[in-house]
């Protein structure tokens, strides 16, 4: 398979994720779209690494996945806390930061 096809797929996944972040108001859906964007960037990194024969981009993709896993833990904890206090996962309700 041509490496350009992987790059096209990466652009498509990133576009879907960006449109989800911009159009949706649910925090969980927005969070999943951000993760989709990170995976699209990882796919592009791995594709470029494969095209040029270097392992540097694959290491960057691996560390990005590690950071994304940590982000999932912290992000879901914040979303669950907001959901418990506000009874809604809407981003519009999260701008009220009073305790």
From Swiss-Prot:
Quaternary structure and interacting proteins, as annotated: NDH-1 is composed of 14 different subunits. Subunits NuoA, H, J, K, L, M, N constitute the membrane sector of the complex.
Class in the EC hierarchy, top level: translocase
Catalytic activity: a quinone + NADH + 5 H(+)(in) = a quinol + NAD(+) + 4 H(+)(out)
Enzyme Commission no: 7.1.1.-
Biological role: NDH-1 shuttles electrons from NADH, via FMN and iron-sulfur (Fe-S) centers, to quinones in the respiratory chain. The immediate electron acceptor for the enzyme in this species is believed to be a menaquinone. Couples the redox reaction to proton translocation (for every two electrons transferred, four hydrogen ions are translocated across the cytoplasmic membrane), and thus conserves the redox energy in a proton gradient.
Gene Ontology MF terms: NADH:ubiquinone reductase (non-electrogenic) activity; quinone binding
Organism of origin: Mycobacterium tuberculosis (strain ATCC 25177 / H37Ra)
Gene: nuoK
Protein name as annotated: NADH-quinone oxidoreductase subunit K
Major localisation: membrane
Keywords, sorted A to Z: Cell membrane, Membrane, NAD, Quinone, Translocase, Transmembrane, Transmembrane helix, Transport
């Amino acid at each position: 398979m041509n490496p350009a096809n992987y790059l096209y797929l990466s652009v498509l996944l990133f576009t879907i994720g960006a449109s989800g972040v911009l159009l949706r108001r649910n925090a969980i859906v927005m969070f999943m779209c951000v993760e989709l964007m990170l995976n699209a960037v990882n796919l592009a990194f791995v594709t470029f690494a494969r095209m040029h024969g270097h392992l540097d981009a694959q290491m960057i993709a691996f560390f990005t996945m590690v950071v994304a896993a940590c982000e999932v833990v912290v992000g879901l904890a914040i979303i669950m806390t907001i959901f418990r206090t506000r009874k809604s996962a809407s981003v519009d309700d999260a701008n009220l930061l009073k305790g």
